[in-house]
Amino acid sequence: MIPLRSKVTTVGRNAAGARALWRATGTKENEFGKPIVAIVNSYTQFVPGHVHLKNVGDIVADAVRKAGGVPKEFNTIAVDDGIAMGHGGMLYSLPSREIIADSVEYMVNAHTADAMVCISNCDKITPGMLNAAMRLNIPVVFVSGGPMEAGKAVVVDGVAHAPTDLITAISASASDAVDDAGLAAVEASACPTCGSCSGMFTANSMNCLTEALGLSLPGNGSTLATHAARRALFEKAGETVVELCRRYYGEEDESVLPRGIATKKAFENAMALDMAMGGSTNTILHILAAAQEGEVDFDLADIDELSKNVPCLSKVAPNSDYHMEDVHRAGGIPALLGELNRGGLLNKDVHSVHSNDLEGWLDDWDIRSGKTTEVATELFHAAPGGIRTTEAFSTENRWDELDTDAAKGCIRDVEHAYTADGGLVVLRGNISPDGAVIKSAGIEEELWNFTGPARVVESQEEAVSVILTKTIQAGEVLVVRYEGPSGGPGMQEMLHPTAFLKGSGLGKKCALITDGRFSGGSSGLSIGHVSPEAAHGGVIGLIENGDIVSIDVHNRKLEVQVSNEELQRRRDAMNASEKPWQPVNRNRVVTKALRAYAKMATSADKGAVRQVD
């Protein structure tokens, strides 16, 4: 039997002072000696993905208490990338992942919690909590706040608009074809409910990946934030974590710990899912970071290999008019995993917080397995309510029928895949010897080969300026550098540049490469995570206006057509300059907090985690 971590503060004469303080928090006499479960919430009124979580912690806590645990709740910070987008606030987004991970570690270790339920949702919160879970390696269950419903709009000329989302609104703001009244209609409908933004953007991608990693319950990634069916997920999470405590502390079963569940094979399955669902490029960054925190031997080379063999089975906004509610109707993540499993593309010897084997897990939850439980079938009938609300569990609408069309539906089988390669591709070449990433699911295959002259800028702000002033021309490659983890610092998302290119009619006529990153809502020929970054001496820092840049997605190449000798001459000149590997004439306030992150941040190929050894 393994002693509870909390025993040091709850048992024995030496713990009298700590017990006195526990009593002051409401702990009862009969609760001492039971596992203390940290309810790691992330409620905030700043973020639609978290605005409905205030009372959710109580639901989880009640379930923990009924199952025999002692729940204690605390909150982490949560940054809304959409609100932070396009100004200095975005510098703080990625570093907030590390702050979240640190704060969870600090609270859990300082108070000797025995286990966690992580109530996450948006872009950096799930990854931050995941990093903490992999560090701490104590029993954990993830349960997110759920996706937002897609918006519905009718533009002023009476033409029905496709389902809308945040990206629709941003792109429309840069389009001359959309007047102010039309823009207002899109804006008013783009984000109609609480929840994480409704497409396969970063937040939803990561919440789906926790299912594949085995750390969350089926339906976690796709059940809408507004649907009453989501309440059962929170209740089950609280019940499950206490069972995991029993198995670990009572039976010494280390297989139920995060590192026992999220093994290398589980990481491979998660990235296979990511390729199949065309997830956000940010998922690569966050999965690499989680692997590093958990000391899992999984790196960019493994992801590259997976992308060569795993087909793209689903295209969801921003790459189509499908949204997360449509993914859910098609069976959610279990249906995608089921198709991959039938295609022989998953490791079978993995388990999860809710199942001891993959086959049983998918038999029960994949609506196409032929063995689906009634509970699973009922869950995936959960449909959007279609009304504006910030309230969780506010609708009980049901789909009349599920989407099981494996040929043309939201989730396809391997035979009817969109592409044979995965939806995410790693590119290498003299610009990115350590790798760069493109969301191939977001571009038509005829654009997979692109060559054009470079238009070099040294900040996101300058990139936006050259687009909106129509300085950039069709056929050019916009190079945005010094926006990496150290160079930014903070590796800003380039959502505004990509959305404005699209809104300006250049989304299929220009390419963009950067050592920064992209929002999960970005689409088009957008290549990010260029490593090494400019601030670390990467070749992207040596590109000059007019240099010919070639992109070959089929052959996974990213090159600048400049000789090695000329690149070395430029490198020597850069090293001899007064301020080498720094942006020229960039006016940006970088605080001490950001400088601290910049000093320790690795490039994107290492997940942009901090290197402190």
Swiss-Prot record:
InterPro entries noted in UniProt: Dihydro-acid_dehy_C, DihydroxyA_deHydtase, DiOHA_6PGluconate_deHydtase_CS, ILV_EDD_C, ILV_EDD_N, IlvD/EDD_N
GO MF assignments: 2 iron, 2 sulfur cluster binding; dihydroxy-acid dehydratase activity; magnesium ion binding
Pathway(s) this gene product operates in, as recorded in its UniProt entry: Amino-acid biosynthesis; L-isoleucine biosynthesis; L-isoleucine from 2-oxobutanoate: step 3/4; Amino-acid biosynthesis; L-valine biosynthesis; L-valine from pyruvate: step 3/4
Catalytic residues (positions): S519 (proton acceptor)
Catalytic activity: (2R)-2,3-dihydroxy-3-methylbutanoate = 3-methyl-2-oxobutanoate + H2O; (2R,3R)-2,3-dihydroxy-3-methylpentanoate = (S)-3-methyl-2-oxopentanoate + H2O
EC code(s) of this entry: 4.2.1.9
Co-factor note (free text): Binds 1 [2Fe-2S] cluster per subunit. This cluster acts as a Lewis acid cofactor.
Binding residue positions for Mg(2+): D81, D123, K124, E493
Described function: Functions in the biosynthesis of branched-chain amino acids. Catalyzes the dehydration of (2R,3R)-2,3-dihydroxy-3-methylpentanoate (2,3-dihydroxy-3-methylvalerate) into 2-oxo-3-methylpentanoate (2-oxo-3-methylvalerate) and of (2R)-2,3-dihydroxy-3-methylbutanoate (2,3-dihydroxyisovalerate) into 2-oxo-3-methylbutanoate (2-oxoisovalerate), the penultimate precursor to L-isoleucine and L-valine, respectively.
HAMAP family according to UniProt: IlvD
Subunit structure: Homodimer.
PANTHER family: D-XYLONATE DEHYDRATASE, D-XYLONATE DEHYDRATASE YAGF-RELATED
Protein name: Dihydroxy-acid dehydratase
Organism the protein comes from: Corynebacterium glutamicum (strain R)
Gene: ilvD
